[in-house]
Amino acid sequence: MYKTYHEIELKFLIDNPRLVHMILKKHKAKFIGKVFEKTLRFDTPNNELEQMGKFLRIRTGFKNVITFKHKIKNRNFKEREEIELEIEDPIKMRQILENLGFTKVLIMEKYREKWWLNNTEIDIDKLPMGSFVEIEGKPREIRQVAKLLQLDFIKRITDNYWDLWAIFTRRNGIKSKNIVFNAVKDIKK
């Protein structure tokens, strides 16, 4: 069974994940779990999906899913139409996609903590380029939770992690198009 979903979210770069944890616990947010996620992003050799604002991925972590996303224009929030299907075997699904011509594959690694508070999903993500809070829900609730977490709405990020990675790699002279921890091991902090 698949689900179609209208996704609205924002992310914020954070320096102090501990502070976010403390605030979430103080407000009795429900902790769902922590996991290492690996995402394989697929496209044609000519990047046809990316050019159309579309995104196809397989993600392993809390569960194994294949997801198709399509951008919706929104200046204040990251908004997408999403179709997601839980899959049993990510390796076989990858083989199917590659045989259909989706041979360009990019990899993203991240550690994700999932929380629920005030009808929003709050993810604390650790990626090679930093830590982020991602808040998903309805716009009003996203704003309320961002304020509760002491996140400045003006500093919200609507770019996806791939766009942020492209900026980060240019600034730091990294050649990898894959968002992997091994790519940043030599960067001096």
What are these regions, as identified by a protein language model?
Residues 142-154:
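Acidic (Asp/Glu-rich), glycine- and aromatic
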Residues 19-20, 141-143:
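Short acidic, Gly/Pro-enriched loop/turn segments at secondary-structure junctions
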Residues 1-121, 155-189:
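N-terminal strand-loop-strand beta-hairpin
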